[in-house]
A protein has these predicted regions:
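Intrinsically disordered, low-complexity acidic segments enriched in Asp/Glu and Pro
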Residues: 1-27, 35-43, 49-53
Length: 53
């Protein structure tokens, strides 16, 4: 299911951020922002704001 797939992508983006691979995380978060549910989009947006800081 697409929602579950986006949850997995959010987890993957967090893992990339922890490893310092912000470029990979940004790419995944962009996809979640395009295809995720409202709740997933909020989570992706919050993670993206952490990348910017």
């Amino acid at each position: 299911e697409l929602g579950d797939d986006m949850d997995t992508k959010l987890d993957l983006a967090k893992a990339y951020m922890e490893m310092g691979d912000d470029e990979a995380a940004e790419s995944i978060l962009k996809e979640v922002l395009e295809k995720g549910t409202g709740e997933q989009m909020v989570a992706a947006s919050e993670l993206r704001s952490r990348l910017a800081s």
